[in-house]
Amino acid sequence: AIKFKTDMKEAHNDLVMVLRKKGDNKSALKVCVHALKSHENDDTLHRNKGNILYALDEPEKALEAFEKALDLNPYVVDTWVNKGTVLWKGLAEREKALAAFDKALEINPNFMAAVDSRINLMAEIKANRPPFWKRIFGG
């Protein structure tokens, strides 16, 4: 039997996911913005909006969306990882990104996306750090 969802919020989220999967991020953003007009306190919609904006190469706006989602629900590990990713790869804010990944791991120490992201970020930080002697003696 076909089951219809009566909650439009879920339907909007589903449509956003389908459009993103098809690569139509602009349409997905329109749906998300429309849905937020009637569901402004839905952290999932804000997280989806952040993911879309990041895919559209708008990291500052994506960060705002993730921060709004976290204001609404600070216990969603995915949102912390997404925020960390935007800070790291979109805005080159490595220390802030590290703090976001650490927060995700504080909530769920076994969340592999957070573990992997933190490991990769630490490797990048280490690779870009000047040699020890330059940090001590300059030059």
Question: What residue spans do the PLM features occupy?
Answer:
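Helix-start (N-cap) detector for alpha-helical repeat units in TPR-like alpha-solenoids
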Residues: 9-10, 43-44, 77-78, 112-113
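Position-specific recognition of the canonical hydrophobic site in helix A of tetratricopeptide repeat
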Residues: 13, 20, 47, 54, ...
